[in-house]
Amino acid sequence: MSRDLHTTAGKIEDLRDRVEEAIHAGSERAVEKQHSKGKKSARERIDLLVDPDSFTEIDEFARHRSTQFGMEKNRPYGDGVVIGTATVDGRPIALYSQDFTVMGGSLGEVHAEKIVKIAEFALKSGIPLIGINDSGGARIQEGVASLNGYGKIFRLNTRSSGVIPQISLILGPCAGGSAYSPALTDFTVMVNETSHMFITGPDVIKTVTGEEVGMEELGGARTHNTRTGNSHYLAENEDDAIDYVKALLSYLPSNNMDATPHLPPTETLEKKASDIALDTLIPDSPNQPYDMKVLIQALVDEGEFLEVHALYAPNIVVCIESVNLKEFTFINKSLNQHLHVIRLIWAIRNQRIKCDI
């Protein structure tokens, strides 16, 4: 049905059609394939993360400008990434969510421009930046324009470090250039058996070195949580990953000049059974281990704390919590693991969390 774009009604209908096309930029087949792998779409992930009706999208009609390799025949709205602002528990955030159903979430020139735009907005506004990564890497059809885009993103990651919280959710493949940015952010969350992050895939490694290695061993979520330390939390599924990020945000200030989130007073100074138990927690023998988490739980408000890097260097406990309504980061040797031994991996983890603080 043709519309008269010279009338207001015609323009409104045309706008609605464009919005609908932008929302469903990926094909039905691509969306079904995404769901069959236990993965959600880019917009479904945003809906889970943010407060209802709080998301305001930016540049939803942006399209790539490439004319090489027949790219001019396929110009979906959004260019494979959704960006915008929203609130989480009433606090403003900026975010981007890569759409694997659109050209594999590959990063091209316009795709990168959108991420840079929202990252700059987050830095100028002093609000957290959440990146939901699900990408096959650089869009090879756009060549060096894609690589230039990565450089701009990395530059903003380093400029924002220590100024605003940067959190990366890895909810699918994160290959090639896409693997660098999450490593530069403050916190990275991955999903077991779904998330993979590596610079070069198994096929290339086999061709170059002759070594056969699987995706899980090379860059799976468990590998990055237990061996490399690039991931801070191993989630069972996407819902678990997003819940962890929301919990993490509840402890963090919006920027380095802001106060930590206000928590309503709940604790009293009355002595509790858990307080008395501390008298006997530490054993008489210095060679006998004890559970440091019991001590932390007794000290913090409501006995609740958020552990970071739980599977990496387990002989040290790193967690974020509030004590008397003020936020703290605890770094404690876990005397249940490798009693009194300082290992290299322990030292690396200790150093990293202090730098992030």
Could you say what each language-model-derived stretch is?
Residues M1-I167, P173, S178-Y180, L184-V204, ...:
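Terminal-region recognition feature
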